[in-house]
């Protein structure tokens, strides 16, 4: 019985606070006092037993565990409802495969209404919400899934994706780390964690620009060197460079035609890009792959 005394003490404390409120009639206050005395007698607790007090009031504990997560404390689902809910989940998964995300959200929502304490339904709806760019709703669904099952690694992973999309990289890192704690061998979590950590370093750096491409590797790329050398043999580029040098030496007075030089430079750059595309498409693909890698990966995140 001693193990429940802190709980009973919290109940007594709550009842005593209520009895001192003006919202109750004298008879109601008297009834509360009787209830307090009964509990103190049965569990052998007195007001002096302050060592039984917990850090949070009973009302705050209740709010944190139930109201904050918007989860019904008990499920009234019957077996028929559970079966129907699972069927709706499967329908939602099919809609996800067909990229019909709004319909998927609707199916998962119906499943939740039938079986509100199933973490998978909330987590799957979070995935659909993210596909619709409803990232705040996705995070809320992940939080609900975690409230039901604190060991659900996929909920932490999907919350990390939504947080990354909202540029909340520090929180995303925390979510991915928790997901990896629960599922250490998941390559998707590892990859997304690295991306979030890189993004966090970029935004935290005083000189961060958000660009992480290795320019040194590009410059040292033999194909790039060949293309650059070829470009410099272009008579138009040679004429442009000569004109720019003349303007630089001549000072402001020689700056007439600067806009023309800029236009020529842009045109030369376009020719350079076209030449690379024609002669070395692999280098262009390297640049494209880098751009793609900057987007967080979610394709490997399968649905339950």
UniProtKB/Swiss-Prot annotation:
Modified residues (Phosphoserine): 293, 295, 297
GO biological process, one term: protein homooligomerization
Residues the record lists as N6-acetyllysine modifications: 131
Extent of the TPR repeats: 15-49, 85-118, 120-152, 153-186
Keyword terms, alphabetized: Acetylation, Chaperone, Phosphoprotein, Repeat, TPR repeat
A Pfam family hit: TPR_11
Record PROSITE patterns: TPR, TPR_REGION
GO molecular function: Hsp70 protein binding; protein heterodimerization activity; protein homodimerization activity
Similarity section: Belongs to the SGT family.
Function: Co-chaperone that binds directly to HSC70 and HSP70 and regulates their ATPase activity.
Subunit structure, interactors included: Homooligomerize.
Name of the protein in question: Small glutamine-rich tetratricopeptide repeat-containing protein beta
Gene that produces this protein: Sgtb
